[in-house]
């Protein structure tokens, strides 16, 4: 970057002269010497070949003003330099990889660099600007204008504020079942109080080995309201991975249903069926209003963990990643703004609960007053079933 343009051109000229003894070595031979892989994907050609004088000369009243030819190159980008009375540059491109607008931008950037080289050959390479001022403004300012106000409050506070705005609106739709914001909030409050009595609070984890259902959404909200962070567990994961996650995360307990008990049975952690917790809440006449801060085992803050998700482990052992309330709320607000999600929207819970995207879908919907559409996994496979689901859900 500290080298001048003149020094760069001199160095390139010297290198080309040094390599000229090998200019007739075929590409096949070079490929064999280098090994596998593409040698290059951009072709540069300087068409410095002679043109017969009788073609360009004058014969009577007939005068040839220019001679040119066209050929095709099997590379994504090719640049041909055509000498003559004026120097011409011709850019070719694979239309399957680059559209006309992209190719035109390449030409404009090249023109700008050449003009800067001619105007100031002593300028440093690092000072050469390939972007037009308008394009630089667009890339560095407009596209980078991603700052948004972070919603002020924990996820329970933000959700409860939405409940107050739209208590009767549909919050979750699953098959023929629809649950309003008010009812979803009440269910989550009752379950949260049961979880608090079982030791769930800030900085404590609760595993969720639950299928796609309304119960899954209730459980997520209940853990957050209790002050804890949830750990999604895909029951279809290999037993070894599930056991590792649970032993590493050390949750207070794991919430299951009958069909997912087997997935966590060998991990040696306390398990509770969610229906049993519902029954305990009903038998104990547990209140359904929002939890007060004093009911929790500790202080819930915006920087408290909201959930923990494990990496794939493709580069080693899986690692647990903790995401805070403020981080998740900010992400949800950004997605809602980007996709125009509001009270009249319906958001499909498409991603697996064990992937980050599922959390974004849930938060984006429930903090915006939209309806979260939950469906069984077999209806989410590409094909007719998914198309029918999307059409029916609106």
Region roles according to the model:
Residues 80-84:
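Short beta-strand micro-motifs enriched in acidic
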Residues 3, 23, 74, 86-128, ...:
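Carrier-protein-dependent adenylate-forming modules in NRPS/ANL systems
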Residues 367-372, 392-393:
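Gly/Ser/Thr-rich phosphate-binding loop
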Residues 1-68, 95-99, 122-125, 201-204, ...:
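His-Asp-centered acyl/peptidyl-transfer active-site segments
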Residues 36-38, 70-74, 164:
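A short catalytic or substrate-binding loop motif that flags glycine-/basic-rich loops and adjacent residues
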Residues 349, 381-394:
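Conserved adenylate-forming
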């Amino acid at each position: 970057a500290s080298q001048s343009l003149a020094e760069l051109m001199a160095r390139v000229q010297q290198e080309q002269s040094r390599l000229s003894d090998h200019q007739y070595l075929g590409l096949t031979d070079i490929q064999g010497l280098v090994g596998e892989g593409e040698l290059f994907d951009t072709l540069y050609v300087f068409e410095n070949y002679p043109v017969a004088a009788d073609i360009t000369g004058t014969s009577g009243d007939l005068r040839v003003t220019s001679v040119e030819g066209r050929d095709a190159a099997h590379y994504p980008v090719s640049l041909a330099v055509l000498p003559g009375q004026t120097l011409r540059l011709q850019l070719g491109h694979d239309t399957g990889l680059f559209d006309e607008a992209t190719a035109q931008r390449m030409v404009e950037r090249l023109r700008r660099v050449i003009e800067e080289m001619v105007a100031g050959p002593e300028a440093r390479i690092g000072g050469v600007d390939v972007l037009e001022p308008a394009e630089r403004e667009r890339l560095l300012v407009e596209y980078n204008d991603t700052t948004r106000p972070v919603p002020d409050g924990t996820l329970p506070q933000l959700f409860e504020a939405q409940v107050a705005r739209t208590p009767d609106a549909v919050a979750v739709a699953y098959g023929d079942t629809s649950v309003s914001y008010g009812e979803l909030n009440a269910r989550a409050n009752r379950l949260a109080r049961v979880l608090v009595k079982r030791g769930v609070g800030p900085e404590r984890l609760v595993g969720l080995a639950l299928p796609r259902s309304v119960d899954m959404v209730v459980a997520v909200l209940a853990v957050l309201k209790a002050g804890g962070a949830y750990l999604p567990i895909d029951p279809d994961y290999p037993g070894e991975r599930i056991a590792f996650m649970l032993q590493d995360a050390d949750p207070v307990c794991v919430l299951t249903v009958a069909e997912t008990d087997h997935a966590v049975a060998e991990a040696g952690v306390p398990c509770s069926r969610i229906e049993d917790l519902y029954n305990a809440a009903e038998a104990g006449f547990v209140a359904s209003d929002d939890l007060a801060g004093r009911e929790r085992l500790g202080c819930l803050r915006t920087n408290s963990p909201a959930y923990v998700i494990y990496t794939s482990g493709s580069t080693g052992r899986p690692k647990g990643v903790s995401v805070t309330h403020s981080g998740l709320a900010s992400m949800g607000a950004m997605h809602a703004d980007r996709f125009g999600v509001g009270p009249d929207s319906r958001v499909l819970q498409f991603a697996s609960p064990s992937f980050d995207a599922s959390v974004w879908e849930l938060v984006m919907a429930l903090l915006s007053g939209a309806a979260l559409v939950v469906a069984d996994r077999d209806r989410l496979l590409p094909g007719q079933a998914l198309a029918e689901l999307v059409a029916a859900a609106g």
